[in-house]
Amino acid sequence: IVDTVLDHLLKIMDFLACNLDSEGGTGCLRALYGDWNDSINELGGTRDPGKLFGSGVSVMATLHFYQNCKEMAAILKKIGLHKEKAAGYSRYRRQIEAGLFQYAIDRNAAQERRVVHGWGDKLSYKIGSWRDPDNRARISSTSHAFWVLSGMIHTDVTMRESILKAFEQLDSKYGL
């Protein structure tokens, strides 16, 4: 059997959709083995016996999937195929939006906002937050960048100031 490019893309989307966090209730994409950023490689793990992965999430990967849902729905509409899948991708986007707004935006005591890089199993800790597991505040450039690149910024334009402030804090003589 030879798959088309479209078949391949649909299989990827199905795989990602099957890995949205339903158990933890965040609706975001579980980290599994991690993403390219070594700082979150353990986010997908769990201490639960018999389970390979937990409910830890990569915000960057979630935002990739969020963007892919929009793009795939547009492709399917354009070619007039898989209307049910296109509708599903729109539902996933709404689910992801709700989850990201509830869990990915971290606030400090002054109510300043930051987009975290991710969180561990059962929201046990966050990375790129105002208070990481080592009690240090960190800023993740990738989660903030993908908040903009994925179009998530259009769902709440007030995040613009928070994102600009995060990048200003990351700016140094060595770059971001």
Feature names for model-found ranges:
Residues H64-L176:
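Catalytic cores of carbohydrate-active enzymes
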Residues I1-V57, E84, G88-W119, K165-L176:
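Active-site acid/base region of carbohydrate-active enzymes
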